[in-house]
A protein has these predicted regions:
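Extended, well-ordered alpha-helical scaffold/bundle regions in very large, multi-domain proteins
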Residues: 43, 53-56, 60-74
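A conserved hydrophobic secondary-structure block that centers on an alpha-helix together
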Residues: 1-44
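Short alpha-helical segments and helix-capping/turn motifs at coil-helix boundaries
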Residues: 17-19, 49, 78-81
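Exposed, low-structure sequence patches enriched in small/polar residues
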Residues: 66-69, 73-335
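Conserved hydrophobic/aromatic pocket- or pore-lining residues that grip, position, or stack substrates
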Residues: 23, 53, 200
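Short loop/turn segments at secondary-structure transitions that flank enzyme active sites
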Residues: 3-6, 29, 40, 59, ...
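Low-complexity, polar/charged sequence tracts that form flexible coils or short amphipathic helices
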Residues: 26, 44-46, 56, 76, ...
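Glycine-rich phosphate/diphosphate-binding loops that line cofactor/substrate pockets in enzymes
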Residues: 24-30, 58, 134-139, 205
Length: 335
């Protein structure tokens, strides 16, 4: 029996209803469109309506833009838009983007979506270039950069960041990479963060490869050093081994986050339809030791399978694990 206040379709009068609409027109490689989304509760609507365009003027020069008007609890500071001209070629990329988010845009639009942050005016640009060499020890050099700054609508500087990177691929299968980041971040106080990373690898375009890296700098008032190493090997055509190491040291370390992390993976294919996969991970700071084993038999390939999995240690990402044992069984069949 329907109660007072219930709708004819059986939903409560206070239950939210959602509606979404989208129209788009393609113009060759380009397109223009309009989108509307709304959540309606107790007779009042909250959501957004906007237009967007992706335009290509030449094979390499294009433009992307969007403008959105939100509505709901707030009537002012409810606009958002961005403008982004760009250049793209097989060996290069460049763009400049300006974004605007009103002070109350997120308060309205997050009823039907998710806006990470509003109350900002943001300027972003990037430049990437790859150069190939036909002779000599260097085969390829790749440069990348990104620049970002944003302010609050009142003109207060909130953040800026500069990223630079330079990668070298050598003909003897060695690779070198260097990157540097500097950042200003304003929270309860002003922070100046920086990070420099150096990487060395061998045969990284293939599965069997090794690599190592070191990163150092300062992050939110703590000096840090991060050392990484990895190796991948195929002892036989049917098996593979992988190992990863991370060593993080923070100074000062008020939250005791300095740690050793080890990750081991192994696979063994007995046939194309019968194989075993193993995974092991430790994290010293949270005393985490996880083991996973998965045995798969495709009795009716490709979709008919029997899978048996064992797991020791369960936890959300970054949390100490419960060292309990869990056994899973899964059987699939497509008719």
């Amino acid at each position: 029996e329907a109660q007072a206040g219930d709708a004819a379709d059986g939903t409560s009068a206070g239950d939210p209803r959602y509606a979404v609409g989208r129209v788009q027109r393609d113009l060759g490689r380009s397109s223009v469109g309009a989108t509307w989304a709304e959540r309606r509760t107790d007779g009042s609507g909250q959501g957004s309506a906007g237009m967007d365009a992706t335009l290509f003027f030449t094979p390499t020069f294009g433009f992307t833009g969007q403008a959105v008007q939100s509505y709901g609890a707030y009537d002012e500071g409810t606009w958002a838009y961005f403008l982004r001209p760009s250049y793209d070629s097989p060996t290069g990329h460049a763009h400049v983007r300006f974004s605007y988010f009103g002070e109350r845009f997120g308060d309205n639009v997050n009823a039907v979506g998710f806006v990470r942050d509003d109350n900002r005016r943001e300027l972003d640009s990037a430049l990437e270039k790859t150069v190939w060499f036909e002779t000599g020890p260097v085969e390829q050099v790749e440069y990348g950069s990104n620049y970002n700054v944003y302010w609050g609508q009142d003109g207060t500087l909130r953040d800026w960041s500069v990223d630079q990177s330079l990668d070298f691929e050598l003909r003897n299968r060695w690779s070198l990479a260097a990157s540097h980041n500097v950042e200003f971040a304003r929270f309860e106080k002003d922070f100046r963060n920086r990070a420099t990373e150096l990487e060395l690898g061998y045969n990284t375009r293939e599965f069997s490869s090794v690599g190592m890296g070191v990163e150092f700098g300062r992050n939110f008032d703590s000096d840090f050093h991060l050392v990484t190493a990895s190796g991948r090997l195929k002892p036989t055509p049917e098996s593979s081994l992988e190992y990863q190491l991370e060593r993080l040291v923070l100074d000062p370390d008020p939250e005791s986050e300095s740690t050793w992390i080890h990750v081991v993976r192994a696979s063994q294919f007995f046939t194309n339809d019968l194989y075993l996969q193993l995974f092991y991970q430790t994290n010293s700071v949270i005393d985490r030791r996880n083991v996973q084993a998965v045995f798969v038999y495709r009795y009716a390939p490709p979709f008919g399978t029997i899978q048996v999995a064992f797991q020791r240690g369960t936890a959300a990402f970054g949390e100490a694990s419960d060292q309990g044992n869990t056994l899973f069984l899964k059987v699939t069949r497509v008719f």
